[in-house]
Amino acid sequence: MKRKYFGTDGIRGQSNIFPMTPDLAMRVGIAVGTIFRNGAHRHRVVIGKDTRLSGYMLENAMVAGFTAAGLDVFLLGPIPTPGVAMLTRSLRADIGVMISASHNAFRDNGIKLFGPDGYKLSDDIEEKIEELLDQDMTRQLAKPEDIGRAKRVDGDIYRYIEQAKRTLPRDVTLTGLRIAIDCANGAAYKVAPSALWELGAEVVPIGTEPNGVNINLECGSTHPAALQKKVHEVRADIGIALDGDADRVLIIDEEGQVIDGDQLMAVIADSWAADGMLKGGGIAATVMSNLGLERYLQARRLKLHRTKVGDRYVVEQMRQDGLNVGGEQSGHIVLSDFGTTGDGLVAALQILAVVKRQGKTVSEICRRFEPVPQVLKNVRISAGKPLEDAGVKQAIADAEAQLAKNGRLLIRPSGTEPLIRVMAEGDDRGKVERIVDELVSVIGAVRNAAA
């Protein structure tokens, strides 16, 4: 089924432009409320958001939709995405909602949905929601006496802070560590510095002054330069860069170098395997993860289970294969012993635990393998299907033959933007760059002809 509303991570788009309009947000509330309105009990939904300006608008629109469908709404305010997943379970809600466009700029926003178990919704349920969104839902509205109520929940962020702190081993404190943290002017601007301070660290926060339009603006995990500068400036032991909704993390070592999600997964997998905590004999990661990670794990008799791009697919693979570590190169790290979705703060705490226990620097701890040269370029498209063109297919086949067993090629449409992503990796950087440039040129020519 071709998706009209949902991408790889919920519904996303520019605020006040379809599909991210208050009208559709209200209809999503009605549709989702209708699907999860099962049984005679009073149904409830929790709604969290990040700090972008349009969050107020979409939050109120969704409240209207859910209450019209007869559900009670608990409003959490700004809180990390993993906090919404946790509180959906804790508050015995039927559905959880996070209003966020993650690492995107403030102009964008999105709607992420969680089931009562705290996991993101399956493709099947999303398809049911899509079907309802295109129907007249008047008959689905609650009777006047059954309309829902809405209330703001106080203290919810402190419950999440306690949950995050409990993931640090009890024999470890952060005393003696100077930690610079960039909260991207986003959802974790209160919780992350507080959690680190309560665990004993000296905390140097940046990106903690949201104003509605500065979320992810030259800060956070997609713009690590600000944190790199701060790490040098204050001589921090480590830098932690979160994104707008704090479900992803990158680390900056004491030398100012960026440590990506692949290296972080290697650290956690190694540490947990040594402690007998790693389940399933491996980890799950997407097709974007570096070949170097796969080779590193193979050398330790651990398996890398590759999935489609999107942390929800990583989680599905983890549940299917009994794994408890998974993630993405971009910094989504899922640790199912502690939660149901990516959690930047919790992942960072696991790295800090290894640093404290081994007494080594972050650069010594986190540089586990030499990444295979990887080149990623995007081709913007506005119409047509360039990947179905015969010339493009032949160019892809030729590229795969050139890489053979010494590399990988991945070409896919973005699930959140009008882009085709072209990625290749291999031991010969020159060859990889040439292959990517040739494919970008071929796809671009087909795009231009279609336009």
Curated annotation (Swiss-Prot):
What's the cofactor?
Answer: Mg(2+)
Where is the catalytic site? 102 (phosphoserine intermediate)
Q: Which residues bind Mg(2+)?
A: 102, 243, 245, 247
Task: Identify the EC number(s).
Answer: 5.4.2.10
Per UniProt, the cofactor note for this protein states: Binds 1 Mg(2+) ion per subunit.
GO MF annotation, one: phosphoglucosamine mutase activity
Keyword Membrane present in the record's keywords: the answer is no
Keywords, A to Z, come to: Isomerase, Magnesium, Metal-binding, Phosphoprotein
Q: Report whether Metal-binding shows up as a keyword of the record.
A: yes
Q: Which GO terms describe its biological process?
A: carbohydrate metabolic process; peptidoglycan biosynthetic process; UDP-N-acetylglucosamine biosynthetic process
Q: Which residues carry this modification: Phosphoserine?
A: 102
Alphabetized Pfam families for the sequence: PGM_PMM_I (PF02878), PGM_PMM_II (PF02879), PGM_PMM_III (PF02880), PGM_PMM_IV (PF00408)
CDD domains documented for this protein: GlmM
A Gene Ontology cellular component where this protein is annotated is:
cytosol
Task: Describe the processing and modification events after translation.
Answer: Activated by phosphorylation.
Q: Which reaction does it catalyse?
A: alpha-D-glucosamine 1-phosphate = D-glucosamine 6-phosphate
Q: What does this protein do?
A: Catalyzes the conversion of glucosamine-6-phosphate to glucosamine-1-phosphate.
The protein's matches in PANTHER family, at most eight in alphabetical order, are given as:
PHOSPHOGLUCOMUTASE (ALPHA-D-GLUCOSE-1,6-BISPHOSPHATE-DEPENDENT), PHOSPHOHEXOSE MUTASE
Report the family membership: Belongs to the phosphohexose mutase family.
What protein is this chain from?
Phosphoglucosamine mutase
State the organism named in the record. Sinorhizobium medicae (strain WSM419) (Ensifer medicae)
